[in-house]
Design a protein with these regions (language model features):
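Non-catalytic, surface-exposed connector residues within folded enzymatic/regulatory domains
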Residues: 22, 43, 58, 62, ...
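Structured loop/turn residues at secondary-structure junctions
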Residues: 125-128, 152, 218, 244
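Primarily NTPase-proximal linker/entry elements flanking Walker-type ATP/GTP-binding cores
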Residues: 4-125, 132-177
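Short hydrophobic/aromatic residue motifs in ordered secondary structure
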Residues: 39-41, 129, 245, 273
């Protein structure tokens, strides 16, 4: 079961997989909804499962379970789950609301990339939150990477500009950019995200670029609604899903992929520096069901 062993699968414990009838399908659909796949995704998954079971004359419970896993894996395959780091530098902009774990996620990704031999620079463009740059600097020291920061209240665009200039001058492989936590319904803060993206496009036009939204798995379907607005503003390329170990509703990964057509790229499964892991659809689905 690997890294996803911490995902609770209690919603599926009561299902009798050997009795394949209408009651089974109804109970399975309810369980998928309770696990946070959402009503639409759950209904579609069960409908497809009915068709597969009928067409292949499946009778064994284990075979039904495997058929469902394959359906969910297909739903998760909406894009490359690996970061595009094909240029030097590559730019990764990390966004999200307050309290979801953006800065911590950046630090853990930096640690992972450093371990892969990458030269990493952290950009402290969260200049609104007190001590945000200090927190990022602690992570820079832990991961043994460089950081560009300014004073509290400085223009985030200026910090980003300086970071990109430093990255080009120093031969950095990856720039990880922290941003202020923002509510998806605050127009000014969302407009600032657009400004940061324009600076990246202007200063590093040929660079590989990622925009990763950090979501707290425990917020479930509410997080999904946030993500839809961020997608419109920021052009998301991937999701970092934190606190997946703290929820019984691990199915949110499937809902995100289906509703947003944006791949989950990393999942947080604990507090340790190595507990932010690249997402693997097969391992995830096997742990879930």
């Amino acid at each position: 079961m690997g890294i996803f062993a911490k995902i609770k699968k209690a919603w599926f414990d009561t299902i009798v997989w050997e009795t394949i009838d209408d009651e089974f399908y109804d109970e399975l659909e309810d369980s998928l909804i309770m696990a946070d796949l959402g009503a639409t995704v759950a209904h579609d998954a069960v409908k497809k499962l009915r068709d597969v079971v009928y067409q292949k004359s499946i009778q064994r419970g284990d075979d039904v379970k495997q058929a469902l896993r394959e359906i969910l894996i297909e739903k998760l395959n909406v894009g490359d789950t690996a970061l595009d780091l094909s240029t030097k530098p590559s730019i990764v902009l990390v966004i999200g609301v307050n309290g979801v774990g953006k800065t911590t996620s950046i630090g853990k990704i930096a640690h992972r990339l450093k371990g892969e031999g990458k030269r990493v620079l952290l950009c402290a463009a969260d200049t609104f939150r007190a001590a945000a740059a200090d927190q990022l600097e602690i992570w820079a020291n832990r991961a043994e990477c460089e950081i560009v920061r300014s004073v509290e209240g400085a223009d985030p665009g200026a910090v980003l500009f300086d970071s990109l200039a430093a990255a080009k001058a120093r031969g950095v492989d990856v720039v990880l950019c922290d941003t202020a936590g923002r509510l998806h319904n605050k127009v000014n803060l969302m407009n600032e995200l657009s400004k940061l993206r324009k600076i990246i496009d202007r200063e590093t036009p040929d660079a590989a670029k990622e925009t990763l939204l950090v979501l707290d798995a425990t917020t479930g379907q509410n997080g999904l609604q946030q993500a839809k607005v961020f997608r419109e503003t920021a052009g998301l390329t991937g999701i970092i899903l934190t606190k997946l170990d703290g929820t019984a509703k691990g199915g949110i990964c499937v809902a995100i992929a289906q509703e947003l057509s944006v791949p989950v790229k990393y999942v947080g499964l604990g507090e340790g520096i190595d507990d932010l892991q690249p997402f693997n659809a097969e391992e995830y689905v096997k742990a879930l069901i």
